[in-house]
Each structure stands twice: as C-alpha cells, then as structure tokens.
C-alpha cells in the first residue's frame, strides 16, 4: 500500500492511499523460489468421474495433497542441454557462450557442465565514423 498526503506546505490534511503491486523483481524472485520447490503430482479420478477430482503428490511426503500455494507439475521438463527431436530442442552443444556473463549466454548455463574452449578473435570492419572539426 502506498499513500500520498495532500495539503498546504506538505501538511497531511487529506491522505490518499492505494494498493500497489510489488516490484517486478520481487515477483520474479518469488516465482523462482516457487519453481525451485515445485512438486510433481498425479491426477486422481473419483470412482465415476472422468475429470480428476484432486491432485496428489507423485512422491508422497507428509501429506498426500499439495498445498494450495505450491507450484505443481505433471510432466518433467525436458533436458534442454541435449538434442531431443521429440520436443524440438536442438540442445546447447556447439553454441557460443560468454565466459564472464551471468546471464542466459553464460558458459556455466549453456555448457551444462561439459566444459568449454576459449579463443580470441579480431574482427575488422567499417566503423562508419565521421570526423567533425569543431574549433
């Protein structure tokens, strides 16, 4: 919730408050935490029901049903490191990576623990520069 005061010289004779969403980064961190703690479930059908009546944990822990706040999944995610024609994933083998990056192009993420070779290269080309005499 955020509030703003209205009044002469900053006095708070009238206060307006409204509900706001959390910052985008906070939402991202919360979703990532949920993703890392997601649980695999399977659908359970009632005796005469075609539609599943509830979900239960695939690997039971203390209780057999996931909490309402749990992030759940039915199928495991494919391994995007390896080529998989069934899912259309081309894998990451042979991709260029950035050794110093911490983003999606980092060698740590793209190489999937296989290691990587480093090399340097020089690129020459037109810079389309212009010289302007100013003084």
Swiss-Prot record:
The cross-references to SMART domains, in alphabetical order and at most eight, read: WNT1 (SM00097)
Chain positions carrying an annotated carbohydrate: 62, 85, 98
Protein keywords: Developmental protein, Disulfide bond, Extracellular matrix, Glycoprotein, Lipoprotein, Secreted, Wnt signaling pathway
> Which chain positions have O-palmitoleoyl serine-type lipid attachment?
9
Give an example GO biological process.
Answer: cell fate commitment
Query: Which cysteines are disulphide-bonded?
Result: 3-17, 5-12, 81-112, 97-107, 134-135
Q: Known InterPro entries for this protein?
A: Wnt, Wnt_C, Wnt_CS
Q: What does this protein do?
A: Ligand for members of the frizzled family of seven transmembrane receptors. Probable developmental protein. May be a signaling molecule which affects the development of discrete regions of tissues. Is likely to signal over only few cell diameters.
* Protein family according to the UniProt entry: Belongs to the Wnt family.
Q: Which PANTHER family does this UniProt record tie to the protein?
A: PROTEIN WNT (PTHR12027:SF115), WNT RELATED (PTHR12027)
Localization in the cell: Secreted, Extracellular space, Extracellular matrix
Q: What is this protein called?
A: Protein Wnt-7c
> Record's Gene Ontology CC terms?
extracellular space
Q: Which residues form a coiled coil?
A: none
- Entry comment on modification after translation: Palmitoleoylation is required for efficient binding to frizzled receptors. Depalmitoleoylation leads to Wnt signaling pathway inhibition.
Gene Ontology molecular-function annotations: cytokine activity; frizzled binding
